[in-house]
UniProtKB/Swiss-Prot annotation:
This is Small ribosomal subunit protein uS14. One of its GO terms (cellular component) is small ribosomal subunit. It comes from Pelagibacter ubique (strain HTCC1062). PANTHER family: 30S RIBOSOMAL PROTEIN S14, SMALL RIBOSOMAL SUBUNIT PROTEIN US14M. The gene is rpsN. InterPro entries: Ribosomal_uS14 (IPR001209), Ribosomal_uS14_bac/plastid (IPR023036), Ribosomal_uS14_CS (IPR018271). The keyword Ribonucleoprotein applies.
Length: 101
Protein backbone atom coordinates (compact mmCIF):
# COMPACT_ATOMS: atom_id res chain seq x y z
CA UNK A 1 0.00 0.00 0.00
CA UNK A 2 1.17 3.49 -0.85
CA UNK A 3 1.38 6.21 1.75
CA UNK A 4 -1.98 7.86 2.30
CA UNK A 5 -0.37 11.29 2.04
CA UNK A 6 0.99 10.48 -1.44
CA UNK A 7 -2.42 9.30 -2.64
CA UNK A 8 -4.11 12.38 -1.16
CA UNK A 9 -1.54 14.68 -2.77
CA UNK A 10 -2.21 13.06 -6.15
CA UNK A 11 -5.99 13.39 -5.68
CA UNK A 12 -5.50 17.07 -4.88
CA UNK A 13 -3.49 17.48 -8.09
CA UNK A 14 -6.23 15.78 -10.10
CA UNK A 15 -8.90 18.14 -8.73
CA UNK A 16 -6.71 21.20 -9.34
CA UNK A 17 -5.83 20.19 -12.90
CA UNK A 18 -9.49 19.51 -13.70
CA UNK A 19 -10.55 22.86 -12.25
CA UNK A 20 -7.98 24.93 -14.17
CA UNK A 21 -7.88 22.86 -17.39
CA UNK A 22 -9.96 25.25 -19.53
CA UNK A 23 -8.10 28.34 -18.31
CA UNK A 24 -4.73 26.70 -18.99
CA UNK A 25 -5.82 25.60 -22.48
CA UNK A 26 -7.08 29.10 -23.36
CA UNK A 27 -3.80 30.69 -22.27
CA UNK A 28 -1.77 28.10 -24.19
CA UNK A 29 -3.82 28.79 -27.29
CA UNK A 30 -3.05 32.52 -27.03
CA UNK A 31 0.66 31.87 -26.48
CA UNK A 32 0.93 29.57 -29.52
CA UNK A 33 -1.09 31.81 -31.88
CA UNK A 34 1.35 33.70 -34.13
CA UNK A 35 -1.36 36.12 -35.33
CA UNK A 36 -1.70 37.73 -31.89
CA UNK A 37 0.73 40.51 -30.99
CA UNK A 38 3.91 39.65 -29.14
CA UNK A 39 2.89 41.78 -26.16
CA UNK A 40 -0.41 39.94 -25.62
CA UNK A 41 1.32 36.58 -26.03
CA UNK A 42 3.90 37.57 -23.43
CA UNK A 43 1.15 38.61 -20.98
CA UNK A 44 -0.60 35.28 -21.55
CA UNK A 45 2.68 33.46 -20.93
CA UNK A 46 3.11 35.29 -17.63
CA UNK A 47 -0.45 34.43 -16.57
CA UNK A 48 0.24 30.82 -17.50
CA UNK A 49 3.38 30.75 -15.39
CA UNK A 50 1.48 32.29 -12.45
CA UNK A 51 -0.95 29.35 -12.38
CA UNK A 52 -0.19 26.71 -9.72
CA UNK A 53 2.45 24.22 -10.78
CA UNK A 54 0.26 21.29 -9.75
CA UNK A 55 -2.51 22.38 -12.13
CA UNK A 56 -0.52 20.97 -15.07
CA UNK A 57 -1.85 17.63 -16.31
CA UNK A 58 1.61 16.05 -16.50
CA UNK A 59 2.05 16.44 -12.72
CA UNK A 60 -0.73 13.89 -12.11
CA UNK A 61 0.44 10.33 -11.49
CA UNK A 62 -1.55 7.30 -12.65
CA UNK A 63 -2.09 5.34 -9.45
CA UNK A 64 -3.73 2.00 -8.76
CA UNK A 65 -7.27 2.44 -7.43
CA UNK A 66 -6.86 -0.49 -5.04
CA UNK A 67 -3.32 -0.18 -3.66
CA UNK A 68 -2.23 3.33 -4.65
CA UNK A 69 0.86 1.92 -6.37
CA UNK A 70 2.32 4.52 -8.79
CA UNK A 71 4.14 2.20 -11.23
CA UNK A 72 2.98 -0.68 -13.40
CA UNK A 73 -0.59 0.63 -13.71
CA UNK A 74 -2.80 -0.37 -16.63
CA UNK A 75 -4.40 2.85 -17.84
CA UNK A 76 -7.61 1.27 -19.05
CA UNK A 77 -8.31 -0.57 -15.80
CA UNK A 78 -6.57 1.86 -13.41
CA UNK A 79 -5.23 -1.18 -11.57
CA UNK A 80 -1.59 -2.14 -11.02
CA UNK A 81 -0.18 -5.33 -12.48
CA UNK A 82 0.09 -6.86 -9.01
CA UNK A 83 -3.52 -6.08 -8.04
CA UNK A 84 -4.68 -7.34 -11.45
CA UNK A 85 -2.88 -10.64 -10.88
CA UNK A 86 -4.37 -11.04 -7.39
CA UNK A 87 -7.89 -10.32 -8.62
CA UNK A 88 -7.40 -12.71 -11.54
CA UNK A 89 -6.15 -15.52 -9.30
CA UNK A 90 -9.16 -15.13 -7.00
CA UNK A 91 -11.49 -15.28 -10.02
CA UNK A 92 -12.83 -11.76 -9.59
CA UNK A 93 -12.10 -10.72 -13.19
CA UNK A 94 -14.36 -12.50 -15.70
CA UNK A 95 -12.53 -14.28 -18.51
CA UNK A 96 -9.12 -14.10 -16.85
CA UNK A 97 -7.50 -17.44 -16.16
CA UNK A 98 -4.05 -18.53 -15.11
CA UNK A 99 -2.07 -19.46 -18.20
CA UNK A 100 -0.53 -22.90 -18.53
CA UNK A 101 1.42 -24.45 -21.40
Amino acid sequence: MAKVSAVNKNNKRIKLSDRLFKKRQALKKIVMDKKISLEERFKAQQKLSNLPRNSAKNRVMNRCQITGRPHGVYRKLKISRIALRDLGLHGLIPGMTKSSW
